[in-house]
């Protein structure tokens, strides 16, 4: 049996992190977690990490698409925080963001790690950005590192 799986270390990986500025009090912690994970666990060098800041979660897919189209990166991490309010706006923003990022991954054959929090409350967002529920930015970075390696292994085997 042949099993293809990735590891986490990706010293030569070039990673773009596309970050929403909206809800920056949460998203800044997600970015810190992602960068820390890329450096400490992936051994990714500073010069191989590019951060792209956009206004909000709706803009993440377009920026990710432009990054992917450049062909200069091995993977993309999308970070943001969409917090439910009193209107259906949350559902549209969260859904379109998720759909758009998945489309980028499939269209450009590049891993796009979804680190966009979709929570009911501000407290839940804070918990997931580095307090008692961990840091989802760091988790998104781990997933990306593994997928970069999985795709490289598949390329070598197929």
From Swiss-Prot:
(2S)-2-hydroxy-3-oxobutyl phosphate binds at residues 86-87, 128. Pathway: Cofactor biosynthesis; riboflavin biosynthesis; riboflavin from 2-hydroxy-3-oxobutyl phosphate and 5-amino-6-(D-ribitylamino)uracil: step 1/2. One of its GO terms (molecular function) is 6,7-dimethyl-8-ribityllumazine synthase activity. Pfam families: DMRL_synthase. 5-amino-6-(D-ribitylamino)uracil binds at residues 22, 57-59, 81-83, 114. The active site is at 89 (proton donor). GO terms for biological process: riboflavin biosynthetic process. Its EC number is 2.5.1.78. Gene3D superfamilies: Lumazine/riboflavin synthase. The keyword Repressor does not apply. It catalyses: (2S)-2-hydroxy-3-oxobutyl phosphate + 5-amino-6-(D-ribitylamino)uracil = 6,7-dimethyl-8-(1-D-ribityl)lumazine + phosphate + 2 H2O + H(+). The keyword Flavoprotein does not apply. It is an enzyme of class 2 (transferase). HAMAP family: Lumazine_synth (MF_00178). NCBIfam families: lumazine-synth, PRK00061.1-4. Forms an icosahedral capsid composed of 60 subunits, arranged as a dodecamer of pentamers. Belongs to the DMRL synthase family. This is 6,7-dimethyl-8-ribityllumazine synthase. It comes from Shewanella pealeana (strain ATCC 700345 / ANG-SQ1). The gene is ribH.
């Amino acid at each position: 049996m042949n099993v293809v799986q990735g590891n986490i270390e990706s010293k030569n990986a070039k990673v773009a992190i596309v970050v929403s500025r909206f809800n920056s009090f949460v998203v800044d912690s997600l970015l810190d977690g992602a960068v820390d994970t890329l450096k400490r666990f992936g051994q990714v060098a500073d010069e191989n990490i590019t951060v792209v800041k956009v206004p909000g979660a709706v803009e993440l897919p377009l920026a990710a698409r432009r990054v992917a189209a450049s062909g200069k990166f091995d993977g993309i991490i999308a970070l943001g925080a969409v917090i439910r309010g009193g209107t259906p706006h949350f559902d549209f923003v969260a859904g379109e963001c998720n759909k758009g990022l998945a489309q980028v991954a499939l269209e450009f054959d590049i891993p796009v790690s979804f680190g966009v929090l979709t929570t009911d409350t501000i407290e839940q967002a804070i918990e997931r950005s580095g307090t008692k529920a961990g840091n989802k930015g760091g988790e998104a970075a781990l997933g990306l590192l593994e997928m970069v390696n999985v795709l490289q292994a598949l390329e070598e085997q197929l």
